[in-house]
């Protein structure tokens, strides 16, 4: 049996002087599309780790940014250790921006972007990248859709030309749409409908967000996917795929001026689009009652209890709030030395595993949660009570200075390791910029982390 318990709000749960809720963790539902399948990827608590690498020896950022006349925002992150580059195009559009009744259209269009243009024949985009010695991929989230290639430095002009081409010149046939619809429906059956954990997660999200579109699955509801057609896809494409709704990030063995010149040549001729006047979404009302979602399924294996909370994201939090949450959850729920693991797994032996997560990257809000997998002969009710005990201990006692310092030190050590990847740098900057942050916000993050106190947590 899988048992999910969701509390969207704890009215009496106030761990910070400036907070209304204790906000806690994830980096969970991130839709990564390899065009062979819709998969869920967790990127963990190190989502902001790469910010440290953006600081030079004197603390100066290495990132350069500029904007073309047509509105295309460009970031360049030089990294000359190897003659390779990562190119990413981020569109400020995701599943939460879909028209009512058309769930899944953002992800559907992402698939269809690999079909063809007048320049690139149907199905040849990824093959062309591969023939040039590179790799490519794409993903859709509630807030963003992104496409990327990793290639040798001298192949950057080619892949930039290809990205600019499909930004403006996508061609779709009825056959393209019908074929891809079948692929996505099969993905949903395989990844969601046949997986009790995914079913529970989908239902918990729908219960957590009663009005906001974050409660709608990125892949879409089955009955609405079936109704998507060619005109739906082209309408979404024509409305949102534009240079003034996109961010180009290039990381690797390049210099800012050469990228700017190349981008002006490849993207500069694409006209901007009117009508992109912000992202207006329904607001989530205040929640006053807990909601419990329970799933019983013979395929589920051991009993699992999860608890979700609404939380601020880095884009929506008050100054210092999200940083305090990151460190709190490092202490509370990250790894075998966390409070929840030591209490439930080591001391009480009620769980085979336990932890937590903080989803900090949403444009409008974030999520947080705890989970525990029951040990033998432990009921869902006992496990739920045990999780509540850990949460109550945090509410009453907070964290110690030693715990905070250890969490901060481990985080910074992780930053150094994580920042070694140019693709992670490109992904991090692109995602944060596409969800309302600035380069200055990103560069200031390490110092804000250092300023977090025990009282903040």
Where are these regions (language model features)?
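Bacterial N-terminal signal peptides
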Residues: 33, 37-51
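Boundary at the C-terminal end of the N-terminal hydrophobic targeting segment
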Residues: 51-59
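N- or domain-start disorder-to-order transition segments that initiate the globular core
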Residues: 58-62, 66-82
């Amino acid at each position: 049996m899988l048992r999910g318990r969701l509390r969207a709000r704890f009215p009496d749960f106030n761990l910070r002087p400036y907070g209304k809720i204790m906000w806690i963790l994830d980096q969970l539902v991130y839709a990564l599309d390899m065009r062979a399948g819709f998969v869920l990827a967790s990127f963990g608590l190190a989502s902001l780790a790469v910010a440290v690498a953006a600081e030079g020896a004197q603390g100066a950022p290495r990132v350069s940014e500029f904007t073309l006349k047509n509105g295309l925002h460009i970031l360049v992150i030089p990294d000359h250790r190897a003659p390779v580059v990562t190119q990413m195009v981020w569109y400020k559009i995701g599943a939460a921006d879909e028209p009512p009744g058309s769930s899944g259209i953002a992800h559907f269009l992402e698939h269809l972007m690999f079909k063809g243009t007048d320049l690139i024949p149907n199905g040849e985009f990824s093959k062309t990248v591969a023939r040039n010695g590179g790799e490519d991929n794409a993903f859709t989230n509630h807030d963003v859709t992104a496409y990327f290639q990793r290639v040798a430095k001298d192949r950057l002009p080619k892949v930039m030309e290809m990205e600019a081409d499909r930004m403006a010149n996508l061609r779709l046939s009825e056959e393209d749409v019908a074929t891809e619809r079948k692929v996505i429906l099969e993905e949903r059956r395989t990844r969601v409908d046949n997986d009790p954990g995914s079913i529970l997660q989908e239902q918990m999200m729908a219960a957590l967000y009663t009005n906001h579109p974050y409660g709608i699955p990125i892949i879409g509801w089955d009955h609405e996917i079936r109704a998507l057609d060619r005109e739906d896809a082209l309408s979404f494409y024509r409305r949102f795929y534009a240079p003034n709704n996109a961010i180009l990030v290039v990381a690797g063995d390049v210099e800012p001026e050469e990228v700017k010149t190349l981008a002006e040549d490849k993207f500069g001729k694409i006209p901007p689009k009117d009508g992109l006047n912000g992202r207006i979404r329904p607001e989530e009302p205040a929640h006053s009652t807990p909601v419990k979602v329970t799933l019983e399924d013979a395929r589920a294996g051991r009993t699992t209890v999860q608890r979700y909370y609404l939380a601020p994201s880095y884009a929506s939090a008050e100054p210092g709030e999200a940083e305090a949450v990151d460190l709190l959850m490092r202490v509370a729920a990250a790894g075998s030395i966390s409070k929840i693991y030591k209490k439930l797994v080591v001391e009480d032996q009620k769980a085979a595993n336990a932890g937590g997560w903080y989803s900090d990257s949403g444009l409008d809000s974030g999520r947080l949660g705890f989970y525990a997998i029951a040990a033998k002969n432990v009921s869902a009710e006992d496990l739920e009570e045990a999780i509540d005990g850990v949460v109550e201990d945090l509410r009453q006692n907070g964290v110690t200075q030693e715990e905070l310092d250890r969490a901060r030190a481990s985080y910074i050590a992780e930053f150094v390791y994580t920042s070694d990847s140019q693709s992670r740098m490109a992904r991090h900057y692109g995602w944060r910029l596409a969800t309302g942050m600035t380069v200055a916000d990103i560069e200031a993050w390490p110092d804000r982390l250092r300023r977090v106190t025990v009282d903040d947590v």
